[in-house]
Design a protein with these regions (language model features):
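Generic N-terminal helix/loop capping motif
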Residues: 33, 48, 52, 87, ...
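A residue-identity detector for tryptophan
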Residues: 27, 48-49, 82, 87, ...
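Residue-level signal for alpha-helical context at structural boundaries
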Residues: 48, 102-103
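Solvent-exposed, flexible loop/coil residues
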Residues: 64, 81-82
Length: 204
C-alpha cells in the first residue's frame, strides 16, 4: 500500500509517548494509505479527522487510544490504528503467499483486499474522535522526593507507604454514541464515504 514504508513487525512501536515528529510521520503514513484506497469521500474524512473538534475534545491526531491502558498518550489512537494495520497487512500478505499459485489473488483482487485492510484497521476506532478530553484529577503519589518536600500535614500513609495527593491532568471520556464502537465507527465513515463506501465485510 505505501511504497516508502516497508511493513514488517519492526514497524510496530513499543513506547509510552510520541514526539511531535513521530506523530507527524504517523499521520502522513495513515493519510497516504487511506488516499491510496481511492474511496470517494476519503479526503473529506481525513480533513475531519485532523480538524479541531472544539469543546476541548481531541481529534484523531491527538487522541489517546484509551484513558489508562494501551496508547494512553497524545497520538496513541493513531499509533494503535497503525499497529493494527501493519499486523493485518502482514497476515493478509502471508495468507495469500501460502496459497497455490493458481489460487493466489490477482493484482486487482490483492489491491482490493489491501484496501479493505487499510479501511478496517485504520478506521476501526474512528468513533474515538471527539471522544476524549482532559480534566484535573487528584491522585496519590508515593514519589519519595515529592513526599519529602511536602508539608508534614499533607503527608498521608497507607499500606504502600507515605504519599501525598497531587492534582494531575487525566483523560476523561465524553461518550455521545448511542451504540457500540463498531457501529459508531461505521456510521461516521459512511457520513463521508456514503452508504456504498464500505463493503459488507468491512461493516462487520
Amino acid at each position: 500500500m505505501l511504497s516508502n514504508v516497508k511493513l514488517t513487525a519492526a514497524n510496530v512501536p513499543h513506547k509510552d509517548s510520541l514526539t511531535t515528529e513521530e506523530k507527524a510521520t504517523l499521520w502522513k503514513n495513515i493519510s497516504s494509505v487511506l488516499i491510496e484506497t481511492g474511496r470517494p469521500g476519503i479526503k473529506r474524512l481525513l480533513n475531519w479527522m485532523q480538524s479541531d473538534c472544539g469543546n476541548g475534545v481531541m481529534n484523531y491526531v491527538n487522541a489517546p487510544a484509551s484513558t489508562k491502558y494501551h496508547g494512553n498518550y497524545p497520538g496513541g489512537l493513531m499509533e494503535h490504528s497503525w499497529n493494527v494495520y501493519v499486523w493485518l497487512t502482514i497476515i493478509v500478505g502471508n495468507a495469500n503467499s501460502m496459497k497455490d499459485a493458481d489460487a493466489q489473488l490477482k493484482n486487482e483482487e490483492s489491491k482490493a483486499m489491501m484496501d479493505s485492510a487499510a479501511i478496517v484497521a485504520l478506521l476501526h476506532d474512528i468513533c474515538k474522535v471527539g471522544f476524549y478530553s482532559m480534566e484535573p484529577k487528584n491522585r496519590k503519589t508515593y514519589d519519595a522526593e515529592k513526599v519529602k518536600n511536602a508539608l508534614q500535614k499533607d503527608v498521608k500513609h497507607d499500606s504502600l507507604g507515605d504519599f501525598i495527593w497531587e492534582t494531575v491532568m487525566s483523560y476523561t471520556v465524553t461518550d455521545t454514541h448511542k451504540f457500540g464502537h463498531g457501529e459508531a465507527s461505521v456510521a461516521i465513515i459512511e457520513k463521508f464515504l456514503g452508504v456504498l463506501g464500505l463493503t459488507t465485510e468491512e461493516r462487520m
